[in-house]
Amino acid sequence: MTTSRCSHLPEVLPDCTSSAAPVVKTVEDCGSLVNGQPQYVMQVSAKDGQLLSTVVRTLATQSPFNDRPMCRICHEGSSQEDLLSPCECTGTLGTIHRSCLEHWLSSSNTSYCELCHFRFAVERKPRPLVEWLRNPGPQHEKRTLFGDMVCFLFITPLATISGWLCLRGAVDHLHFSSRLEAVGLIALTVALFTIYLFWTLRRYGHQSKPFWNQSSRS
């Protein structure tokens, strides 16, 4: 059976009645019982035929209670938090909790509704540095961060001492009228600090991009 009625899904943002991304639901009887209730399988497909989700539900979930407004992400009502209609989606897909919306936008790293493509007014706020260091992310990112910190602690004093020795040698050569050697040492010092700053900025940008993107949005 195929129908055009909107549905809400537990794992992906459900579709709504908009021409941007129409959804087709195919309901099939799977012939099994759960707590004495028959089940059906609902497959939700996008316009291009891509399968978005397969949901197994019991017929008991189809009750007048489910007609109440609920959040399309967590499927909870407005008892704990008010429901908002921030985008152009309608029906059961048009209401959502603010906290659920912020968490969804943060996880997907987007600033628009993926159903109706309405663009939200998003303000990105970087996470506090202490929280960033405490929870840097997955295990491989933690290892990368630890390696970069060790390299930084090792290279920084090495670059500082090397630069100081080069400048000291350049001053000594100037006193002995060896300008060519002095210019060479000064150029070496400049190149050393340029490479050091370039490496530091590159590593900082690489580490901060995935972590600081996990921001609070409003």
UniProtKB/Swiss-Prot annotation:
Q: What is its EC number?
A: 2.3.2.27
- Per UniProt, where does Zn(2+) 2 bind? C87, C89, C113, C116
Provide a GO biological process annotation: endocytosis
| Pathway(s) this gene product operates in, as recorded in its UniProt entry | Protein modification; protein ubiquitination
For this UniProt record, the keywords arranged alphabetically read as follows: Cytoplasmic vesicle, Endocytosis, Endosome, Membrane, Metal-binding, Transferase, Transmembrane, Transmembrane helix, Ubl conjugation pathway, Zinc, Zinc-finger
What is any one of the record's Gene Ontology cellular component terms?
A: early endosome membrane
Fetch the PROSITE patterns from UniProt.
Answer: ZF_RING_CH (PS51292)
Q: One Pfam family from the UniProt entry?
A: RINGv
- Primary localization: membrane
Reaction(s) catalysed (UniProt annotation): S-ubiquitinyl-[E2 ubiquitin-conjugating enzyme]-L-cysteine + [acceptor protein]-L-lysine = [E2 ubiquitin-conjugating enzyme]-L-cysteine + N(6)-ubiquitinyl-[acceptor protein]-L-lysine
Q: Which Gene3D superfamilies match?
A: Zinc/RING finger domain, C3HC4 (zinc finger) (3.30.40.10)
| One function term, GO molecular function aspect | transferase activity
Instruction: Name its cellular compartments.
Output: Cytoplasmic vesicle membrane; Early endosome membrane
Membrane-crossing segments per the record: 145-165, 180-200
Q: What does this protein do?
A: E3 ubiquitin-protein ligase which may be involved in endosomal trafficking. E3 ubiquitin ligases accept ubiquitin from an E2 ubiquitin-conjugating enzyme in the form of a thioester and then directly transfer the ubiquitin to targeted substrates.
Subunit structure and binding partners: Interacts with MARCHF2 and STX6.
Its domain comment says: The RING-CH-type zinc finger domain is required for E3 ligase activity.
Specify the protein name: E3 ubiquitin-protein ligase MARCHF3
Name its species: Mus musculus (Mouse)
Q: What is the lineage of its organism?
A: Eukaryota, Metazoa, Chordata, Craniata, Vertebrata
